[in-house]
Amino acid sequence: MDNYDESRVFFREMCKNNGVDFPYRRGVIMSELHTPCCPVVCKLILPDPLTIDYISKIQQKPFLCIQFCSVLPCLPILEEFEHRSKNETLSRHFVDYEGAITLLTFDELFNKYSKIEDNHFVFHMDSNKYLLNEHTSKKIIDLINPSMAFIPTLSLKHSERKKWSTRKRTRFNDLYQSYYETLLKCSNKTKLVKPIHPCIEHKDMGDFEAIEFPGFGFGESLNERYELIKEMGANLIGKELRIIQLKTGTPLEILHAVLLGFDVVISPYPEILSLQGCALSFELPSEIEDNCEPEYVLNLLNEKCKFIDGVYKDQINDIVDLKNSVYISDVETPMDEKSIMKESRAYVNHLLNCKEMDGNIILSAHNLYMYEMLFQRIRDSIENNTLVSFVHNFVKCNLKED
């Protein structure tokens, strides 16, 4: 895994839009990872079911998002391996991310949100209960040695902002301060990511090169999200790496986040679809022709992305349900013509119905590649100063027919 080298600039802009409300830009992290980008969210401590070699075929620079909750059950093994490695010459690490840039997140992206008991975060995995405090968090960072790590906080959802009591706000801030002071003592060069939140007071806490906007993706409309982010980011100097974690992270949510200036958008959507037996399949506009205003495009995204039954759903054609029986005989059509995975829809349908592991592997690789391709087009359009038009054309060419 890549650690931050003090001789390099952690994040630098390559080109940007000068609009105050729409500060979208292209950049590079640690001289290798081009932004805007989306990491592969690991369901387990490793990016199961794919290997690093597989991910390297999808992403030019592997970028992994690892969850605290997936590391906690492995903590005794990690500690034992670390102890033995000091006394024995071992050929490789127990968890070897092989050149990937890694980001350790507190959010549970595939499960229900965590709770607090006696100042411990509580996770439930495989019917087992795990507790996380600031000292355990520090231990995990020292063992995993990620490139970046979020500071765990009780993430208050902006969709429930009117329900925040003074007691809850104070608890949120105290929890953050406690974790921050402990994690500063980590022995490695992991970059801590500062959360920007109305409940957090940043007093004498130094400069951060990476920031996140927590609490989004839980029912607020995209227009509400825009207004809140604009308010929360009003005092930023603009040089920080900007990160947002989304609970769903659909294509339209991705485009919305990039327009608002986020460099890293964490989305479990490709992996969630893979578990559901669904394949991403959308058109990428080949020609960019129009001069839409950003405000118009934001309203269009708000109209076409709705919060339904606890998740965000795009009102466009972007998903193929390969469990559906209509694909049993579709041996000619790939999941998407643009994909690196050339298996037919009928073949994947067969694998899914037989509960073959290869079905999940093929779908995971396909969906991650589709998102990587979307982000590459986003980066190209920013460089060509056509991002707003690209977003508008993307929505138009994927609209569902009435």
UniProtKB/Swiss-Prot annotation:
Domain of life: Eukaryota
Pfam family, one: TGT
GO terms, molecular function: glycosyltransferase activity
Keyword Acetylation tagged: no
Keywords: Glycosyltransferase, Transferase
GO process terms (BP): tRNA-guanine transglycosylation
Alphabetized InterPro entries for the sequence: Queuine_tRNA-ribosyltrfase (IPR050852), TGT-like_sf (IPR036511), tRNA_ribo_trans-like (IPR002616)
Family: Belongs to the queuine tRNA-ribosyltransferase family.
Name this polypeptide is given: Queuine tRNA-ribosyltransferase-like protein
UniProt lineage: Eukaryota, Sar, Alveolata, Apicomplexa, Aconoidasida
